[in-house]
UniProtKB/Swiss-Prot annotation:
One GO CC annotation: matrix side of mitochondrial inner membrane
Organism: Saccharomyces cerevisiae (strain ATCC 204508 / S288c)
Organism classification: Eukaryota, Fungi, Dikarya, Ascomycota, Saccharomycotina
This protein's name: Genetic interactor of prohibitin 5, mitochondrial
Similarity annotation: Belongs to the GEP5 family.
GO biological process: mitochondrial genome maintenance; mitochondrial tRNA 5'-end processing
Protein localization: Mitochondrion
Amino acid sequence: MASQVNALLLPVIESTPLHQITKVALTTTLTSKQSDYKFKEIAVPLTKSLQLYEKAQRRQDLRASLKALESIIYQTHFQWNNPLPRHAHLFQKHYHFLLTHWPFENHRDLVDSIAVNNGKLNSTSSRSVWLKADWITLFNVKNPWVQTPPSLMRLSGTDLDTFTPERIFLINSLGNHYKFLIANSHLSYNHKKYPSPGVQIPVRNALGEVSPAKQIAQLFARQLSHIYKSLFIENPPLSPENELALTAVFYDETVERRLRRLYMRACARAYTTTNADSTTEPLMFHCTRWEVD
């Protein structure tokens, strides 16, 4: 199937006004050995964008044509051909640890604490708490609702819950990543505002009853899925290799001004890691800026 689809897509890619670096990246990604699922994950949205581009060209709709090309540029360099940062891989590796230690706020406990706090609601769910706090301290409490799957039961409780150097690196890198995106809201996907990442456990009724443990565990799973999608799929950091590739596009003297502007718009939300090779110090992030005419 992949070879047949590529036979249709590759000539269309070559006919676009995109820079050769983007064309090579696209071609390499499509023709590399990968599962059918992974291939479809790229080929389906790419086909849609190329169809939009061709239709816009026939209608001489410049705006729609440029929008389609912008989408292809962004998806090629930021998603399809962009290696995940180290803390994304660690997120997957230590998923169960994050699931059992992800910070939460139990609304029942929150209501009960009002009397102790002289009638004041002492919530920890505000973004300011997450922006100021040491993230390691936020992860110190293990939640009682997520059960350890049988496949992990062979590991000791210490192994499952210990704050190893790798896990500390992961948590602090996630904290830096979240704080960076909050501080640079112009980078967010569709101008989305990032809420407090803690899990909220609501009361079900006026009696203060909470949901069954299984439903609460699902809240943690959904929140981690949302966090991963927000940081690594919708708005991922640009890899150092891709930053260099795009820099070569911007400073290519043969590139016409219109095409350079197209790439500038497509890459307006670019940011990357300052210390991508670090394995001890948590990752830091900075906005990528290309000073071009």
